[in-house]
Amino acid sequence: MAAIFSITIRRARRDDVGVIVAMLADDPLGSGRERLEDPLPASYFRAFEVLEHASHIQLVVAEDEDGAVIGCLQLCVLPGLSSQGASRGLIEDVRVATHCRSRGVGEKIVQWAVAEARAKGCALVELLTHNTRVDAQRFYARLGFQPSHVGMTLRF
């Protein structure tokens, strides 16, 4: 596939929620977590309202030249006392539309998030990826991320 050379990264809008949820659901893990229904469950829109007004969180989308949403991620800036009071960026929910994968979209949006975290004074950027997502782990390693922690989850 040819690389996508021109994408626009912007804050997500309410009318993007359906496309974002569809991308979140478009893999074996996400398909079991997300509910793609028509209409979309109100819980997604309530969560979007919280994200939209949180000053330390940016939910962004990547648009192609035609204005179609083809990727997304969430960047959280977390202040902390560790590392001498350093803030850290947490990158979450990185997704690229199936038909646009392996075309540079993921790399561009992750690079945007790293630059944004740095511009906001973060000393480091972290992300989590499920241990079964071997391709994603290779992708992040190629971008300079290194395995450093063991993630633990407790679901309610």
Name the predicted role of every residue range.
Residues T8-A22:
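A short beta-loop-alpha structural element at the N-terminal edge
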Residues E49-V61, L90:
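A short helix-loop-beta-strand connector motif used in the catalytic cores of GNAT acetyltransferases and
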Residues V61, A68-V77, L90, R95:
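Conserved beta-strand in the GNAT
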Residues E107, N131-H149, L154:
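Conserved active-site alpha-helix within GNAT-family acetyltransferase domains
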Residues V110, A117-T129:
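Conserved GNAT acetyl-CoA-binding A-motif
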